[in-house]
Amino acid sequence: MKRAIVFVWLLLLCGPHLDAQQDTPPPFPTQPKPSAAASAPAPAIVPVPVTPPRPNGKIQNSLVRITVTEEEPDYKAPWNAGAIQRGVGAGFVIDGSRIMTNAHVVSNSRYITVEREGDPNKYRATVLFVAHDCDLALITVSAPGFFKNMTPLKFGGIPELESTVSAYGYPIGGERMSVTAGIVSRIDFQLYTHSSIDQHLAIQISAQINPGNSGGPVMQNGKVIGVAFQGYSGDVAQGVAYMVPTPVIRRFLKDIADGHYNGYVDLAITYSKLQNPAQRKFLGLKDDDRGVLITTVVAAGPCAGVLREGDVLLAMDDHPIASDSNVELEGERVEFPEVVERKFKGDKVKLNIRRDKQPMTVTVQLNAVWPYLIQGHRYDVRPRYVVYGGLLFQPLNLDLIDAYQPTDLRIRHFFDYFVVEQIYLEHPDVIVLTNILPDPINTYLTAYRGGIVDEINGKKIHTLEDLAKTFSETSDRFVVKMIGEGPPLVLDPKQVEAARERIKMRYNVMKEQNLEEQPAAKTAQDQNKI
């Protein structure tokens, strides 16, 4: 295509000149011919293009290209190493000889290298901190002198709507830096797809963000105002991309200041807006467009025993909550959970509420809430499982749902309503019989696949550890009752033991169980102490 374009361009330049020669009458014969030197036209003066200004400076001295080799867990055969994959992202240098990028760029990583502009070498990098709940990470390079000629970038604030921004990175795996420009289109709460459960402040921009841009800085007036992290494909929406804004970035950096990332805290409540006049009148509320109705208080959350269903939440830390659930922060209207988003584990928040038509003020000490973890993706961990008699038992979570795509409505209900219906109070782990490794000792058991374990030999099974411990006990038989109707599954321990090595060798089961990351306690109240 390049050659064709140049050829047409030359034709356009030459075309008018040829036409002019044909229209001009021939010179008189008596007129002497001018010399070649005299007849040569004066050279045209072609203006030299002026290099456009760089509003953000020379970013090449701050940007790096990150190449990651990762191992994705295999939830269908969790004893095996998963598939090896390779990905490319971007990062940028900040103070303290650190490189900021996205968590999804370095998740499940086994080997990381970074490259600098103008340097042919690849440098080994290691992860310092990773925050999967807000899709941010810090890595570093230990090679001497790596950061010597690199310029740490500074952070700015929240940009104005319709203001211009520039996104930097290495889209589609390119080896040279790319820059795209766009405007700020929206400032709102958005789902962070890396975890698939966390919602934080995010800024929508029209600059093109493609694979390889992830982790790169989005800049304005020489300062970082966000980190590019997700967007829609062209089939869904055009020119819709998102960046992690600086309030989220600053919270992450403050959280890790003590050398440990605690993660986001949460009120662990659900609520409904109070915009209907009749509903407001029924609740005895003023016609002032304030307040939201508390509909659920999670027993494992910090509001348990403080808030009740039916309370009306009017203000948070003296920020009035509108009936559409928004508050005003830094001149912007955002969802009221943003007030809590900026707090940390152990911080307190003051709540103005209305209970039984009476005003009250209460205080809540904030903490992380473990039941939500089942509905989010897990990274940098090995899947938990138990294999017994060729039966594979695993705790229910989002990664398991993605791997097996179950159609059983009972499994979907336990997953979807795990928090809202507080299923975790009885089942901190929802143990599913996900697969059967065929062997003579487990024939005719296919109908039990997808079942949720309720009890074994009359003993309630609450966690994966309970299941493993029960199977290790001495018994003539194990009677496994699933949730719902139907006959129990029965296993003969002697037959299971006789087939143990045979099954391990046949299916390359190197390890029969992995119990890591189980809930640390049995009660919801104790579980909240994390």
Each predicted region: which residue ranges?
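Generic structural signal for buried aliphatic residues
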Residues: I99, I112, P159, V165, ...
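Conserved active-site neighborhood of the chymotrypsin/trypsin-like protease fold
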Residues: E72-P73, D95-M177, P211, P359-T361, ...
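Bacterial N-terminal signal peptides
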Residues: I5-P16
